[in-house]
Amino acid sequence: MNRIFLPGTYADGVPYELLRELRGAVPVCWVQEPAVGAWPAGPGYWAVLRHADVRHVLRTPELFSSHLGATQVRDPDSAAELQFTRTMMLNQDPPDHSRLRRIVAGAFTPRALGELTSAIERHAADLVGSVREHGEADFVHLAADLPVRTLAVIMGVPEQDRQLLVDWANRVIGYQDADYAHSSTADPDRLTDLGRTALALRPTTTTTPDGRPVNPRSRAALTDMFAYAHALAERPRPGSVLARMRDGGLSPAEFETMFFLFAVAGNETVRNSLPGGLYTLLGHPAQYRLLMRRPELLAPAVEEMLRFWPPVLHFRRTATQDVELAGVRIRRGEKVVVHHAAANRDETVFPDPDRFDITRTPNDHVSFGYGPHFCVGAQLARIQLKAMLHQVITRLPGLDLVPGTVPARLGSNFQNGLKHLPIQWQRSSGCGIGCGR
């Protein structure tokens, strides 16, 4: 049963068959946490696999807390690090969670997103236009630039410093996938003075004195990012998320973890969803042809992509008291982990759940969470997904995977991402939406 914990399992794909079997037999099951590499073993946790149970856990913070042990399966390395991590909005319970969410919610109103949509659509068009005549590209690399551009706009990060956002996100992914642990792609000659100062503060030590790897999510490993955030906040763009954070009465730790949440988590949701969604669509040619014939299905197609390829595989809660869930007695202080991928294939909610169907309605997936912690940027993510996929399927005729492609997946039990996705298309202009494939 500990297979669903091991990060290496997911390098071969989400184990949907195992999740289906467990969901039917033991929908709340105990999972061991063996040591992984240099990371020590953990105490184990309860995995929650049914859609209804997942929703119940997510909507009852009085029973299942985000704050007691944060929202990652593994606890931070020290009590001090846990205290810092708990200041993040993601790791708070009401009323503090509500207070933090109100500070940034104004950036995600329908009006604010409406003003941002044209810029996102323009960025998507520019990215696809930059490769259109090449006939092939790695869609992971191509798509990764869209959330970075979007975040730079809403956070007020100068264009010259955007690549820092990529490096910070990569280093956090490196917590489980070593290919990303030492990302350093920002060009010092292109950075602003703030960016160059931050780059000089980048930690170079990758192990602790006792030989354990430094947790790339820790405060010590992200000193450059936090220094940059504080410096940029001294001259924020009016109306930006950073300006709202500066003026919102946040403590220094709350400010830093909020910046982390946008710069890293806000990046990875779209960065994982776009390649995963396109890979899923191209793997179902009949559904691709249907979308080409009926472009009005793009919005429900995006929802089905999110159901089929949730960008985040799980989140953790901690029981605040002894409680029963699906007939299982959970003790106070035990870890409870909701599995989005399992809930999204629950046959009691989704008829024929393993079938990819862009006309599926309703589509009550939990890829953006549920309850108080429903993703504040969910609509922004949807706008980006629709903008990029619209450009790809209308401007890259004959789109397909490069023959023989076996996409490399992240070795992560938390993020559902691809490392590479080679795609190809016809260079000459021709068929777009409105004709077949």
Language model features by range: what are they?
Residues 1-437:
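Cytochrome P450
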